[in-house]
Amino acid sequence: MFSRKKRELMKTPSLSKKSRAGSPAPQNDLTRKDVTDSSNDLASSPPSNSSPVSSGTLKRPSSLSRHASAAGIPLSSPRGKATKPASTPSPPESGEGPFIDVEDISQLLGDVARFAERLEKLRDVVQDEELKETRRPLAHECLGEALRLLRQVINKYPLLNTVETLTAAGTLISKVKGFHYESSIENDKRDFEKALESMAVCFSSTISEFLMGEVDSSTLLSLPPGDQSQSMESLCGGLSGGEGALPSAHEYVEAGGHLGEDVDVILQRSDGGVQAALLYAKNMAKYLKDLSSYIEKRTILEMEYAKGLQKLVNAYKGTLNQETHMPFQSIYSVALEQDLEHGHGILHTALTLQHQTFLQPINMRRQEHEKRRKEVKEQWQRAQRKLMEAESNLRKARQAYMQRSEEHERALYNATRAEEEQSHSGTRSLDKKRRAEEEAKNRAEEAMATYRTCIADAKTQKQELEDVKVNVLRQLQELIKQSDQILRSATISYYQSMHMQTAPLPVGFQMLCESSKLYDLGQQYASYVRQLGAVNEPETSYDFQPYTPQITWSPCIRARKSSFNSQDIPSSENKEISGEERGVERRGGRGHQVHKSWPTAITEGDPAVSSATVPAFPEKLHQPLSPTENVDQKRLSASFEQSINGLSGSLEVQNSTGPFRNIGLSRAALTHRLRKLRTPSKCRECNSYVYFQGAECEECSLACHKKCLETLAIQCGHKKLQGRLLLFGRDFSETALRSPDHIPFLIRKCVSEIEERALIMKGIYRVNGVKTRVEKLCQAFENGKELVELSQASPHDLSNVLKLYLRQLPEPLIPFRLYNGLMGLAKESLRGTETGKGPRLQDKGPNTETDVLSIVVQLKELLQDLPSENRTTLQYLVKHLCRVSEQEQLNKMSPSNLGIVFGPALMRPRPTDATVSLSSLVDYPHQARIVETLIIFYSTIFQEPVSNTDIGTGNSSSDDTASMQSRARLQVTVEEDLSELTPEYQIPVFKEPGASTVESDSESDGAEDIPGTWKPQTTRGHLTKEASVTSAEDIPYIEGEAQSESEEDRDQTQENLAENNTNQSNNVAVNGHCCVPHFHCHTQLPAIRMMHGKIYVSSADRRPHFV
């Protein structure tokens, strides 16, 4: 019975199926094959395993990546037969991006389509249950074809050799090899489907990023020259076998991958297999105990270190920050903060490991493991005891049977001899012998029956032991798998926590290192000396002092003293005094002095005031201003000069930012009036909380770290900054309708900055920006909106932000409903020639080809269905791309290249299934064709009728818009559209001075100075309405005869009071026809009067504002 059971075990489905798909020849008889012939190697099965121990203890290389672990296969060693490339491709530099020829794109997309077909075929073969015995070799063959095609693509384009791609490939290989083709298991099907979808999505995203020039260099496999174990050749080369190579993935899966069946069969066949499994389970429990003890003690050490580090930081934090203006003080302050945060992170991670992720699950699993192991062991020992009892009874029965048989044989012999000797003896003796023989026979038969019963019982117990053995081995395997699962999740969580805990350290140390390199020697000492604000040391004079009587003879008489003492007289070393000035000083000391109650204002360079009439004021009256007064004076001076000269910069830059003026500030940070942070807030630059060493703006309430002021990109809007706006991934219409021109401000700002600085930059929109800077720019746009300052941002980062915004729209700029029509139109345009490239797109005017012209007309009709805001934005964006393509000789960005980049960003199919996204890559040439057509035939597709009003006011409106946006310091907001025309204004009649009433005297500010010859005139002016602080009404201007009054006084030598009066500094010129600078122009400023609560100006070239 035992032998029959053994034969049944040998004929299990797994072994029979494996033998039917087994190796056709031993490994030594295999001929050497090239690495590219991977389909035959994948289709073939491994050679017969004669030593399961050796195959079960395979050692992987130390440089094994996570894709090999996921695949469950060993990679070939450097001494293997796999082909090695001559050089290892290195990731591209940050400044140069990958370029691919337009001709190669179609070939690449063809390979992608074939790869998608191989994956579809592999899925059909694996899921087809009708194939039965041929499913395994066919699946291996399909997998080999897909991997061979994938390797060819990666060899041709090394930038596709990413960790994610190889990880997905390794996972797919392991799922195909470990699939149970004999029995349909739902878990295997789900795992296989998930691996297939992951492979398709990963390869699709990698191809998309490669075509758009956005391959992240951090995901590339940068291999040392001697280590090729993480390449695609190693992944496929390890599968093809050969001399000196490790066993293939198929061998590994069949020898150690079929954990469910092969391991049990091996242990069932081997002597002492259950004892070995129980011993392994016992050792595993001990291993879990030692491992948890190690992690616990290590966690305790880290907690002690964290507590000691926090204690050290708290002890020295106040000491190091006590003195100001010390070298590297900000660096070490940041380092202390990082150490404090690191200590908090260590304590948090330790508590998490103790109670959630590692120690508690491992200890609970170890206890359960021990309990189950003892139960299984008791079950096995109980079955063994039953078999031993049956075998003992069998031995006793066999001995009794032999003894009774021998006695029966002896009795039978005695009875036979008694019959022969019957003549010599009596019948009584013969009967006695016969009865003895009969009793011996009965006892022998009874012993034989007992013996047979014991044999049957022993066989039964043996069979039960075999059944218990199978059950015990299965339970032990499940127990070990469960423990492995818990240990794997705990290990992953542990090292992920360690990574999250230690990852910020190198970044922080690198930041501190780079900041330390920027320190200039003696910088803080110089800052310390400058902030002292020390008064000049007074000159000490040693002069003769005459004796003064102590007794005053008359209380009404006292000595007359000079207004200035000897210390107030400037020394000859600092100031040379002419003889005339000394005479004036002596007269001022002895003679009569005239005291005034107001200060005398003297303008430098005033020709009407000579140096002789200027009194020599003592130096004590010229003390330097305090830092705050100096800052205010500089700010007022700068504002005055800009207002007088009519200059309005694109960015308001303050001269000082309070207590943070001595650190390096970005251009946007200089626009804020900063003070020390009073309450904890969230930093608008790094999006983390600010507790200490923070700054906030007095006007817009922006909060920021002190270290983040160097990179701040949000300008001051002179009003409270709004909360964070969800910008990326938001519906396009919601963002577009917030702008007056229905174009999102992000698109307009990025495009304007790129057109200003990067139209001739090589590879614009193709070279990838730095990922961290791009994320910071996106965050700045969401925090600051239109106030983001982009003059210091890299153009490649700006292009990345623009593409990222377009790609993350829930519905693309060209809606889903137009996608099929556009793709059909593109396919129709490419179907014209034999090569599949279609006619060349070229705008020849009236001589344009008929086919091309029909495509353009159909495209124009399709775009008529776009919503207004989508069409406006698309037109604006395509116009910008036209300007970029006009510089093709310098930036290498032709319309076709721009189509490749912006095709997937402007249009995409409606999302359905993951595998469809891989097939949609075939539409890339069609998307690029549509965008290329839009760029080349922009004037035809987006042509609009131009009215006379638009011609007359278009330029002025755009100029007014730019001027209004650049004048941020006046705090003026636009209330109406700048292109709107203002109504007519009727200028009232100015009254005669004699006829002015009391009311007019109280309301007119100097109106009596206006000549009575001015007449009312009706003027029509295209004025822009502005929301002022004092009044929102429109300001008329005065023309005609009043202007001649200013022209008649142009030749007078006396300067206009408006040039020196700060009350006139807001009278700013709005026309730019004067080519002479304002400070050289001798034209007097026009008169400005206020009557009846309104401002009247005598020239349309001036626009006053209240400040």
Curated annotation (Swiss-Prot):
SUPFAM superfamilies: BAR/IMD domain-like, Cysteine-rich domain, GTPase activation domain, GAP. One of its GO terms (cellular component) is membrane. Residues 37-55 have a biased composition (Low complexity). Its main location: cytoplasm. Keywords: Cell membrane, Cell projection, Coiled coil, Cytoplasm, GTPase activation, Membrane, Metal-binding, Zinc, Zinc-finger. Residues 103-132, 363-485 form a coiled coil. Residues 261-524 form the F-BAR domain. Transmembrane segments: none annotated. The keyword Membrane applies. Residues 1-99, 414-444, 564-595, 981-1036 are annotated as: Disordered. Pfam families: C1_1, GMIP-like_FCH, RHG29_45_N, RhoGAP. GO terms for biological process: negative regulation of small GTPase mediated signal transduction; signal transduction. A zinc finger (Phorbol-ester/DAG-type) spans 671-716. SMART domains: C1, FCH, RhoGAP. The keyword Membrane applies. GO terms for molecular function: GTPase activator activity; zinc ion binding. Residues 414-423, 434-444, 573-588 have a biased composition (Basic and acidic residues). Residues 56-66, 1015-1031 have a biased composition (Polar residues). Residues 730-942 form the Rho-GAP domain. Contains a GTPase activator for the Rho-type GTPases (RhoGAP) domain that would be able to negatively regulate the actin cytoskeleton as well as cell spreading. However, also contains N-terminally a BAR-domin which is able to play an autoinhibitory effect on this RhoGAP activity. Rho-GAP domain is able to regulate RhoGTPase activity, actin cytoskeleton and cell spreading. However N-terminally BAR domain plays an autoinhibitory role. This is Rho GTPase-activating protein 45. It comes from Xenopus laevis.
